[in-house]
Amino acid sequence: MASTDEPAAASGDSTARARQAEAIVNHAEHSISEDAIVAAARERAVDIGAGAVTPAVGALLCVLAKLTGAKAVVEVGTGAGVSGLWLLSGMREDGVLTTIDVEPEHQRIAKQAFSEAGVGPGRTRLISGRAQEVLTRLADESYDLVFIDAAPADQPQFVVEGVRLLRPGGAIVVHRAALGGRAGDASAKDSEVSAVREAARLIAEDERLTPVLIPLGDGLLAAARD
């Protein structure tokens, strides 16, 4: 006969695992230190109301850029340049970051951050415009890393374009892939959640891609292309 204590024990184990997972993520998020230039860019991001990746997400972007030997990178969502600085720190010294943002003011501020970091003008290509239009003008299989930090509603379209841009051996990274956990909540049906799930489906069903969901920031969906 099953013990009546089993459901309570199972619930307790689940709660303990959830707390442990939260503690691990919290430790990861606070284990990365940023230099003064990135910290200043982060402060400017707050001033202009532009989102910025967490230090742990930035460090992961740096690692992915190093692992892919990234020479050509596309970023959707320049913001104040925080993620761009992290990407550049992991790219090859002759690498070029193409970063797209619809807000010219964001790009002006990001350009300041890049200059403060000693990044030469030839290493960045800042394009002001709608990513929906800009991405379609970029060449197929010409980029080592694509980073998408955009509104959830735009993720499916940007994933399609981003995968098209990837060279074999490259990687695509989608920020805000968890929406604070809502993306994994079966009861959540709103348009943002639906769009994020569609982006994840597109990646999961592409046989050329090997994906992983990483619980940093607001969730990162990363995938390597064969």
Swiss-Prot record:
Keyword terms of this UniProt record: Methyltransferase, S-adenosyl-L-methionine, Transferase
SUPFAM superfamilies with a match to the protein in the record: S-adenosyl-L-methionine-dependent methyltransferases (SSF53335)
InterPro entries noted in UniProt: Cation-dep_OMT, SAM-dependent_MTases_sf, SAM_O-MeTrfase
Database matches in CDD domains: AdoMet_MTases (cd02440)
EC number of this enzyme: 2.1.1.-
Signal peptide: none
UniProt-annotated binding residues for substrate: 149
Binding sites annotated in the UniProt record for S-adenosyl-L-methionine: 53, 75, 77-78, 83, 101-102
Single Gene Ontology BP annotation: methylation
Record GO terms (molecular function): O-methyltransferase activity; S-adenosylmethionine-dependent methyltransferase activity
Membership in a protein family: Belongs to the class I-like SAM-binding methyltransferase superfamily. Cation-dependent O-methyltransferase family.
Protein name: Putative O-methyltransferase Mflv_2199
